Amino acid sequence: MTKNKLDLIFKSYDIRGIYGDSLDQDIAYKIGKAFAEFVPDDNIIVGHDGRISNIEMLDAFTSGIKSINKEIIYVGLVPTDTVYSLSGLLKKPGAIITASHNPKNYNGLKLCNAGAIPIGENSGLMDIKKLADRNVEIRIEKFQNNDKYLGNEYYEHLKKLVSPESISQKLNFGIDGGNGVFGAVFDTLNNIYKFNVKSIYLEVDGNFPNHPADPSDESNLTDLKNLVIDNDLDFGIAFDGDADRGVFIDNLGRVISGSMMTVLISEFLSTQKKQFRVVHNVNVSPHALNIMKNNNVELYKCKVGHSNIKKMMRDVDADFGGEHSAHFYYRDNFYADSAILTLLIFMKLLSNNKDKLSLIIDNYNFPPSSGEINFAVEDINESISKIERIFEGEFDHTDGLSCLHKNFWFNVRGSNTENKLRINVEADTQEILDQVLEKISSSI
């Protein structure tokens, strides 16, 4: 039974499942013990987001770690990127208890080795799975806080990367915390950076009472759009549940895609270096890639997933990494992704530009794009094969199927966590885009 559950919850780059079904305290204990055995260090950083099952998960996971006499560096209720940054700063392995943007009945774990080195399918996660698949005596005790919270180190790290003085106090923006964990760090960030901000849904509530903490679904951005437009703000940002991803909108309430953000940030950061390397995943749009190429940015393509992009960034010594899903990675942040750091860099970018954000975006002439659309399918591989058979163009199979045609481009790939196809389309016109989407949907 445990083995079947482990098969369900161990994904390509994290652990995720329905709490009380495929994931429970016994399994969390075994994973904690396995993780502690896998990493060589005697001290492990542990934090969690605001999910309703997190205290039970924390008790079980930390009990597993302590069962082999290793110590917990507890950092409390924090975003995922706080654990990553502290793992890099302290050179200690880390774990964050979270299921990111998934519904409230889910929970899980993201793990990293010392130095914020990701633990994924090909970098130790399956070894941890094997270690967890054993019959062991389970003794779960209430976790006792050891008061080792290292928040100051994290905030000092952010200040070194983006100083408060570099951000204009004239910027007015909106934040939708989505009732996720960003609300737990907002006050401290605000005290440091003196934001001129209007905010909604900052109360951490694992029931997500206002809308799902998934900003990739544009329907969840309605309240933020209204906030920005009604108050004539410069931009807005919506965070997901563990605040490692933030989706931006411009002053007109239009979503700024991950591809657009990859261009904006790389163009801004590359002005500070003669040679600038960017790792991108397969669904960053060709238009975005062409803009970066024309700016003499060195580009490296990889599969979707934070462990994949972080590994390639280390391999090629990249400065920045961008995903169309709005995860952004920085060499100066131990190659880890950080929505909070992205917000600060974006504000610094706007502080150096007098134009409205909508005008900045329009000057790039991005063609119509679909955003990420999900299709539930029975067989992912068969569905991708069907799509390939009905299109002509230049195909790439780095991750799923990408098709480059003279009038359009698309990428279709299987989800790593669900039986779904994730589809992104870009086309010269909205009419062509609609035709491509209709052709894809009718084939599957």
Question: Over which residues does each language-model region extend?
Answer:
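Phosphate-binding and adjacent anionic-ligand microenvironments
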Residues: K273-I444
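Gly/Ser/Thr-rich active-site loops/lids in small-molecule metabolic enzymes
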Residues: S199-Y201, R254-K273, A339-K348, N352
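N-terminal small/polar loop signature for handling phosphorylated ligands or for N-terminal nucleophile
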Residues: I44-N107, L189-I249
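Glycine-rich phosphate-binding loop
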Residues: G94-Y106, V228-D250, V255, L299-S338
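Gly/Ser/Thr-enriched, mixed-charge loops and adjacent short helices
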Residues: N107-I229
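Short glycine-rich phosphate-binding loop at a beta-alpha junction
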Residues: N43-D49, I73, N172-G174, F276-V282, ...
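An N-terminal, well-structured beta->alpha segment
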Residues: M1-S63, S67-N69, Q144-L171
